[in-house]
C-alpha cells in the first residue's frame, strides 16, 4: 500500500484526500498548520465557472469540464456519506454584459458550447428585467445565462470532504506545521533532481511517505524551496460582504448567481447574499505586503457600490459579515499547478 501525505487541508487538499481515499491502494495522511479550511478557502465564494468561461480547449477547459461533471455526483455522495448538508446553488450563473462590442465573442462561445453539449443563453435587456426584476438594466447590453454552472460553499464543502475522508480511513493532523523533509536518492526518472521525499517532519512527529502532495496555498513557496523545487505562488485578495434582506431579491424561484463588472452576487437562501470580488495585486507583491494592503473598509465599500450599481435593492440590506483574505495564484505559469 502506497503512503501519501497531503500538506494543506483547504478545499483543494481535502478534495484530493477524499478522492484518494476511494482508492484502496493508497494510505492517506493529511497535515495542516491550522484547522481545515482556515486559509484561502475561507476567502472564496465558490462560484464554479465552467461553461461560461471563455476557456474552450486545452488543459484548462478539460479540468473545468471534469470538475463540473464530478460535482454533480460528489455533492449527493458526500451528503449521504457524512449526513452534512452542503450549501449549493444549481440555478446557474447570469453574467451581465455592459458593452455590445463584447457580444460577438459571447455568440462565438455559445456556438462552441452547443457543439460541446452545453447551453449558453444570450438574453436581451428586457428578458433580464423580466426574469430578474431586481437588476438595473439601464446600462445592460445583454446578459449571458449559463444554467449548468453552479456555486457551492467552500467551507461547507471542505468540512464534508474532511468528514468523508476520515470515514474512509484518512488520518488528519491539524495544528501541525511542517518543519522539514527527509530526501532520499532515487532513480533519475523518479524525480527531477534524482531525489525523492521519504519523510515529512512536524514539530511533534515524523511520518514516512512514498509521495507528498503540496496543497498549501500561499505556503507552497517556502515548502517547495525547502525541497529545492520552488513553485512561485503569489497572493490575490478575496473580499466579500454578507447582506441580509427581509425578502429575497427578484423571483423567489429563480435565484442564480449574478456577475456584473467582476463583482459576484451570490444567493444563500432566506434573504442572505454574498457580494464579493477579487483584487489583483502587482506581480511582485509579497504575501506580507499584501496583508498590509488590506484597507477593508475602503475596498469593501467599492465592491458594495459596484454591486449596488447593477442591483440597487441590496443597498437596503443589513451587512451581517465582512471579510477579506488572501488566495494563492501561480506566478509565471498557468493555474492550477499540477
Q: At which residue positions do the language-model features occur?
A:
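Helical element adjacent to the flavin cofactor pocket in flavoenzyme catalytic cores
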Residues: 143-189, 194-203, 207
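A short, glycine/Asx- and small/polar-enriched loop/turn
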Residues: 43, 101, 134-140, 182-188, ...
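A generic structural motif
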Residues: 24-29, 171
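Active-site substrate-recognition segment that forms the wall
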Residues: 5, 15-24, 33, 44-52, ...
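Beta1/beta-strand and adjacent pyrophosphate-binding region of the FAD-binding site
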Residues: 1-12, 29
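Short loop/edge segments at beta-strand edges and connector loops
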Residues: 32, 124-125, 174-176, 182, ...
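Helix-loop-beta segment of a Rossmann-like dinucleotide-binding subdomain
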Residues: 84-96, 109-111, 116, 121-168, ...
